[in-house]
């Protein structure tokens, strides 16, 4: 079954180069949503939180062909967003959101449901900026425990070790988010295999279907990976799909405002 995938991106630094309260969409929020945004100390964090609310609403309203005002987003106990009205067995509209460094993305698709609950059916997405997480040269060693011996060897043997580190990291995070357990799960238990690593490392910008596969608890996922250049910095995006999905395209829609 071929799936149309919606991939939306908003660069909050470009879209809203002013303080949060001057953003027109801020006034469209409910009182509780505004209070949620106002709790953030830094404007970048507040803008990403605002964009996350709006981009999910925009995505679901597009998929359901309704007004954004009609969309009600809920979250699971683990914090995974969903829209109850988008659950229409034998299919559901599933989506996942991620943000980093002022960039907010959401990916969604209509997927076949699984009443038996015996196989993964959800999408997971993660974005990360490819830059050191600390000033110390040995900062990667602090994260060695989340990688298998083969994965760690791949990181350390590569001339682009920081890229391989973040590629593996974002693939594992995408799987955990597909499962709806986030970092409460153990990334070490996710085994990632790259199929197009050289193309990812040697391209300035690229989007690759089935760039990797991952196995967790006996289940398998395909991972599409996108390498984006934003604000002169490299970002990696991993999107995890159930393996029976056939993806039609790899395009992103960049939103200038919401």
Swiss-Prot record:
Q: Which GO terms describe its biological process?
A: lysine biosynthetic process; lysine biosynthetic process via aminoadipic acid
Q: Where in the cell is it found?
A: Cytoplasm; Nucleus
The protein's annotated catalytic reaction(s) are: apo-[ACP] + CoA = holo-[ACP] + adenosine 3',5'-bisphosphate + H(+)
EC class (word): transferase
Gene Ontology molecular function: any one: holo-[acyl-carrier-protein] synthase activity
Member of which family? Answer: Belongs to the P-Pant transferase superfamily. AcpS family.
Which protein is depicted?
L-aminoadipate-semialdehyde dehydrogenase-phosphopantetheinyl transferase
The scientific name of the source species is: Schizosaccharomyces pombe (strain 972 / ATCC 24843) (Fission yeast)
């Amino acid at each position: 079954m071929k799936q149309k995938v919606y991939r939306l991106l908003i660069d909050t630094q470009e879209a809203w180069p002013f303080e949060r309260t001057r953003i027109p969409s801020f006034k469209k929020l409910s009182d509780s949503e505004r209070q949620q945004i106002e709790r953030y100390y830094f404007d970048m964090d507040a803008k990403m939180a605002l964009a996350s609310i709006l981009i999910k609403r925009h995505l679901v309203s597009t998929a359901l062909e309704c007004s954004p005002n009609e969309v009600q987003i809920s979250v699971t106990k683990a914090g995974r967003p969903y829209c109850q009205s988008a659950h229409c067995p034998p299919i559901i509209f599933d989506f996942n959101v991620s943000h980093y460094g002022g960039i907010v993305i959401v990916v969604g698709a209509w997927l076949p449901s699984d009443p038996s609950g015996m196989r993964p059916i959800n999408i997971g997405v993660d974005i990360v900026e490819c830059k050191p997480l600390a000033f110390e040269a040995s900062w990667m060693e602090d994260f060695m425990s989340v990688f298998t011996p083969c994965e760690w060897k791949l990181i350390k043997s590569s001339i682009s070790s920081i890229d391989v580190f973040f590629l593996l990291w974002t693939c594992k995070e995408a799987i955990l988010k597909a499962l709806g357990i986030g970092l409460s799960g153990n990334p070490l238990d996710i085994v990632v295999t790259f199929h197009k690593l050289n193309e990812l490392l040697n391209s300035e910008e690229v989007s690759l279907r089935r760039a990797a596969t991952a196995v967790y608890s006996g289940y398998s996922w395909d991972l599409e990976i996108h390498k984006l250049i934003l604000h002169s910095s490299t970002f990696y995006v991993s999107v995890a799909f159930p393996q029976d999905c056939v993806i039609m395209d790899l395009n992103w829609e960049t939103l200038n405002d919401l």
